[in-house]
Amino acid sequence: TPTANTVEDLFECDDDNDGVLSFDFAESQNQVLAGQDSTAFSVTYHLSQEDADTNTNALAIPYFNTNTTEQIFVRIENNANTSCFDTTSFNLNVFDTPVANTVQTYEVCDDLNDGDDANGQTEVILTDFNNEVLNGQDADLFDITYHLSQEDADTNTNAIVSPYYNNGAPFSYQVFVRIENSLKVECYSTTEFTINIYTTPTANTVEDLFECDDDND
């Protein structure tokens, strides 16, 4: 009698967010077999324990899920005697991948908050861009972080804190945005935008003008 070894749950990101993905269960089959002879045993997948026990309604491979969370029942049987079988189950989970919408270039005037309004450095409240990144997506489902490189955004490292003071890149710098599914952080996308800081001009004192009107008009 074959042994239905433990199969890890599947967690997949849905890039087009239609809730449907294709599964071939190749890795799941390797886990079920766990070294048992694949020529001596057959593995099938079902949507209920009863179907797995009776070997009915086996799922076609590739399988396209109908719900974002499903329990899959696995049957492994001896090809020489199909009454010798074992079953196990695992969960299939599909998560939405958020869209990182375009953020327009942000332009701001330098100020005296740091004592110098001509050094191209000022605080920017990055969280003010969250709505632009979301563009209608549910903020409760996704987390947004800001980074100074694409690599940091992809690896979700070195997130910069809002408000951010650009003490290393005066006048202009790029910000890389990561938006991820709060339930499955591997489901994410990124975008980037530029922040330009302009020197605030000084309005110097102008002397009053006094003129004579020769024709008195």
Which residue stretches match the model-derived regions?
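Extracellular low-complexity Ser/Thr/Asn/Gly-rich intrinsically disordered segments
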Residues: 1-217
